[in-house]
């Protein structure tokens, strides 16, 4: 079974319904199979200024995910990535988390993760 780690942008698009039906179907399938997110994605996603009703729905949505915490191994991998690549800290944490858990990173921003040793998947791409 494949494992998928959803990037924050995918959480936002999916939660807000900002995707075509075919893309939503792809993401829904991934969520049913393996709904995992990094702790940083939880912080980024729940840090959005939701109204009270949206906030409750967002918290329920995230509660369905397996939250992957920071570990010493992930921290070391983040340090190694940032020494070699110009990448934002949250992206480095998400990438290192995907590698640590042998997960495919599901993101719309695959270019942010070019040159890193991990598999990415953009559900917005055709096919």
Locate each region found by the language model.
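Acidic, PIN/NYN-like endoribonuclease modules and their adjacent C-terminal/linker elements
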Residues: 3, 95, 100-127
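Generic structural signal for small/hydrophobic residues in well-ordered secondary structure
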Residues: 7-8, 45, 78, 98, ...
């Amino acid at each position: 079974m494949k494992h998928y780690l959803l990037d924050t942008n995918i959480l936002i698009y999916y939660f807000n319904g900002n995707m075509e039906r075919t893309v939503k179907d792809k993401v829904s399938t991934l969520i049913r199979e393996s709904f995992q997110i990094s702790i940083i994605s939880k912080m980024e996603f729940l840090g959005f200024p939701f109204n009270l009703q949206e906030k409750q729905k967002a918290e329920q949505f995230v509660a369905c995910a397996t939250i992957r915490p920071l570990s010493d191994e992930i921290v070391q991998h983040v340090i190694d990535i940032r020494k070699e690549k110009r990448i934002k800290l949250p992206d480095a944490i998400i990438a290192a988390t995907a590698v640590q858990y042998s997960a495919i990173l599901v993101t719309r921003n695959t270019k942010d993760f070019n040159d890193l040793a991990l598999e990415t998947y953009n559900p917005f791409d055709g096919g």
